[in-house]
């Protein structure tokens, strides 16, 4: 859709340039701009035609396309998750807040249990519980992630197919993670507040809840964002947003060099909660202190550094991701 729209726009720009040339006489710079526009349109058309041809050729020969051969969970882990940096932030922040090391972690909405596995890999005294209501994705995690752990390490990971609002663990945990915005599946204050109260019950006396959140004025728009990765493209789509209810529908798509696509590999039907709402709900649930950790920026470039610190004022950027840290 966006390629087609871009091609139309370029054609219109090329038309304006040519119209000016015909009316006012040839101008070298305008001629170059016109030709560049035509060349870009031609390249876009050629790439689209070649991709369609590749897909059709694969199907004609009975071969599977790259999209058909790909595993959506592998693509997700490569494009969305960075468990190493997440581990570093959680362990470092907990130690700074509580003056001790966290050992027992619960990963809510754990999916393929990537963070559970990262947690037990780091220290021999670390244990983890992953909770997800989807049994299929838990099975995938057992087969592809837990199986790769060193002998004995997998015994320190428990995966539970349960509702995060009802789950209990044998003993209180040091840390609960609710990452990748999954808690936004709860669309009412009653539902989300109930989840937060359940988390509070499951934490040790000095336990901490870690969450991420996203926002910015572009998060309310119906847009697509593309990111090129090794061997595929990741596409994040805001398919619809309702400003009255706050409900947002998002999709993750993947596209491949042969022109094939994995459309709607993942779909998220959420409420886009704001930071003030989340802080209020966490406080109402009984957490003693709630802080927003905002990404720091480089003074020279203005770009994010990947480091997060407590903040009470944030930049009104088009898009941002931050962490919420709630202490029991």
Q: Positions of the model-derived regions?
A:
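Conserved SAM-binding loop
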Residues: 141-142
């Amino acid at each position: 859709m966006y390629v087609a729209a871009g091609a139309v726009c370029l054609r219109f720009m090329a038309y304006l340039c040519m119209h000016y040339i015909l009316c006012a006489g040839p101008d070298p710079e305008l001629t170059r701009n016109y030709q560049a526009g035509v060349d870009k349109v031609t390249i876009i058309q050629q790439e689209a035609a070649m991709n369609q041809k590749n897909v059709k050729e694969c199907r004609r020969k009975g071969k599977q396309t790259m999209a058909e051969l790909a595993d959506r969970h592998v693509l997700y882990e490569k494009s969305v998750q960075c468990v190493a940096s997440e581990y570093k932030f959680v362990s470092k922040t907990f130690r700074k807040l509580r003056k001790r090391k966290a050992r027992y972690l619960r990963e809510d909405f754990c999916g393929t249990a990537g963070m559970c596995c990262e947690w037990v890999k780091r220290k021999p005294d670390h244990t983890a519980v992953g909770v997800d209501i989807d049994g299929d994705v838990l099975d995938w995690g057992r087969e592809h992630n837990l199986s790769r752990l060193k002998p004995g390490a997998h015994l320190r990971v428990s995966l539970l197919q349960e509702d995060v609002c009802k789950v209990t663990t044998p003993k209180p945990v040091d840390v609960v993670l609710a990452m990748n915005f999954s808690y936004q599946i709860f669309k009412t204050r009653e539902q989300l507040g109930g989840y937060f109260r359940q988390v509070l019950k499951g934490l040790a006396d000095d336990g901490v809840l870690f969450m991420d959140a996203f926002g910015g004025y572009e998060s309310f728009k119906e847009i697509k964002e593309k990111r090129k990765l090794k061997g595929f493209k990741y596409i994040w789509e805001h398919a619809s947003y309702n400003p009255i209810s706050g409900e947002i529908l998002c999709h993750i798509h993947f596209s491949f060099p042969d022109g094939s696509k994995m459309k709607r590999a993942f779909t998220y039907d959420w409420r886009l909660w704001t930071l003030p709402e989340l802080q209020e709900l966490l406080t109402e649930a009984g957490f003693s202190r709630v802080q927003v950790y905002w990404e720091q920026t480089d003074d020279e470039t203005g770009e994010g550094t990947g480091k997060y610190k407590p903040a009470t004022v944030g930049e009104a950027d088009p898009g941002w991701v931050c962490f919420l840290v709630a202490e029991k």
